[in-house]
A protein has these predicted regions:
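Hydrophobic alpha-helical segments within soluble ligand-binding/sensing domains
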Residues: 24, 120-165, 265-285
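Short beta-strand elements in bilobed, periplasmic/extracellular small-molecule ligand-binding domains
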Residues: 56-76, 137-138, 187-203
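Pocket-lining segment of extracytoplasmic ligand-binding domains
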Residues: 175-245, 251
Length: 331
């Protein structure tokens, strides 16, 4: 009987420790921010996060250290492990790859509030949008642009004629690209829109795939989220525009690079949202009581150079709300 009682007490103690890990009890905490690459959007999100912490009067209580891996996955892993070994109380990975790495390295030992992850469920960071896994202790903010929003916008601006299809392109090596491609394809299936899907491996391959298109067969091209091509969109954008095929992206960087249209995200607000979650956790809210929070204040972005080249006239409601940009060439 004593052995059984001891076992029960041990289990209760373990459960208490596990529960305590999701709730902050310290007056001062160390927060490690990790990002794989240096990007203007990440800078904006980081500054927004710090501003929210400062507005809460907690800049001297929530001590933040930010490190970048400069594009090297091995360095990113080392940074996260350093946060673990250094006794950090909370890790904030920026974007999907660092978030995936953080949950695998931390294994539920350190709470994680990720920032700007496209789909934490698809990426196996959370079991669903509202549930924190005890194995990962991760929640945070998402910047995903709904597939129905982008596709219906494309249909309104460049209607699908009889016999035409949508051409969906995605980077086969990027989790976010696969995720947004599948969401777009599923939405097209649900609406009965005809479409084709093709994968590419890099920017030159995307141009090769585009050159093989028949302009009379497709109403437009939809490019799934891809940080590589978003930063180097000029070649693909120019190729499709010269062919007379409108191309829609899911990041405003794509529009600045030569896509006709996308929806933009204010990453300062994403940072504010993440900062709010950090403040709430610091003040005692359990991690499991904080579902993933989704950004929803999307703004329409139109490339006026591409619009003019294609001779497209925007519907009045879109023209009234759009932010216009011109093509920016990558260095």
């Amino acid at each position: 009987m004593k052995k059984v009682l001891a076992l029960v007490l041990a289990v209760i103690m373990l459960m208490a420790v596990a529960a305590a890990e999701t709730v902050n009890t310290k007056e001062t905490i160390k927060v490690g921010v990790v990002q794989l690459v240096d990007m203007a959007d990440s800078d904006s999100a980081y500054e927004g996060m710090l501003a929210t912490i400062a507005e809460a009067g907690l800049s001297d209580k929530i001590i933040v250290e930010r490190q970048s891996a400069a594009g090297d996955a091995g360095t990113m892993t080392t940074i996260i492990q350093g946060f673990v070994d250094g006794g950090y109380d909370l890790i904030v990975p920026v974007l999907t790859p660092p978030a995936q790495a953080a949950v695998n390295i931390c294994g539920g030992e350190i709470p994680i509030i990720f920032m700007s992850v496209v789909d934490p469920v698809y990426s196996k960071i959370m079991p669903d949008w509202n549930t924190v896994s005890p194995d990962f202790l991760a929640t945070g903010t998402s910047n995903t642009i709904p597939a129905d929003l982008m596709i219906e916008t494309a249909n309104d601006i460049t209607p699908i004629a009889e016999g035409e299809k949508i051409f969906i392109m995605y980077n086969t090596s990027q989790n976010n690209a696969q995720c947004t491609m599948e969401a777009a394809a599923a939405y097209c299936d649900s609406m009965g829109y005809a479409y084709d899907v093709v994968g590419y491996t890099d920017v030159p391959d995307s141009v090769t795939q585009a050159n093989a298109l028949d302009p009379d067969e497709y109403a437009y091209v939809y490019v799934a989220l891809d940080s590589v091509i978003a930063a180097n969109f000029n070649q693909l954008g120019e190729t499709l525009t010269e062919m007379g095929i409108p191309v829609y992206g899911v990041a405003d960087a794509m529009t600045k690079g030569g896509a006709l249209c996308s929806y933009g995200v204010d990453y300062t607000i994403v940072g504010n949202m993440t900062g709010e979650m950090i403040v709430e956790w610091y003040n005692g809210t359990a991690l499991e009581d904080m579902p993933c929070r989704r950004y929803s204040e999307f703004s329409l972005v139109i490339n006026s150079d591409v619009q003019a080249a294609l001779g497209i006239e925007l519907p009045e409601d879109y023209a009234a709300q759009a932010t216009y940009v011109t093509t920016v060439r990558a260095n």
